[in-house]
Curated annotation (Swiss-Prot):
One GO term (biological process): translation
Family according to the record: Belongs to the universal ribosomal protein uS10 family.
Name of the molecule in the record: Small ribosomal subunit protein uS10
HAMAP family noted in UniProt: Ribosomal_uS10
Keyword Repeat found: no
Organism annotation: Thiobacillus denitrificans (strain ATCC 25259 / T1)
Keyword annotations of the record: Ribonucleoprotein, Ribosomal protein
Complexes and interactors: Part of the 30S ribosomal subunit.
GO molecular function: structural constituent of ribosome; tRNA binding
GO cellular component, as recorded: ribonucleoprotein complex; ribosome
Domain of life: Bacteria
Classification via PROSITE patterns: RIBOSOMAL_S10
Keyword Hydrolase listed: no
Function: Involved in the binding of tRNA to the ribosomes.
Length: 102
């Protein structure tokens, strides 16, 4: 696998989980001899919801809820076969969504 790169995008609602997962991926890739660029923090998307507190009147009284989606981006340059095998065997937490592009 010469002159290739693996691009890894992580998504999670909890920033501690995503940072821990990114650190595991970086350590695994460096242990197998690959060069890692990142993790680069991408903008956090915030989705807000306004809900009426009362079922009948008082429209001016509302609750506000939000979901924050944290994202990270990493590039693994010149990966070896060992790197790919180690990344496939890596066990990440359930709250982290991983996208891998070769």
């Amino acid at each position: 696998m010469q002159n290739q790169k693996i691009r890894i995008r992580l998504k999670a609602f909890d920033y501690k989980l995503i940072d821990q997962s990114a650190l595991e991926i970086v350590e695994t890739a460096k242990r197998t001899g690959a060069v890692v660029k990142g993790p680069v923090p991408l903008p956090t998307s915030i989705e807000r919801f306004d809900v009426l507190r009362s079922p009948h009147v008082n429209k001016s009284s509302r609750d506000q809820f939000e979901i924050r989606t944290h994202r990270r981006l990493m590039d693994i340059m010149d990966p070896t076969d060992k790197t790919v095998d180690a990344l496939m065997k890596l066990d990440l937490p359930a709250g982290v969504d991983v996208e891998i592009k070769l």
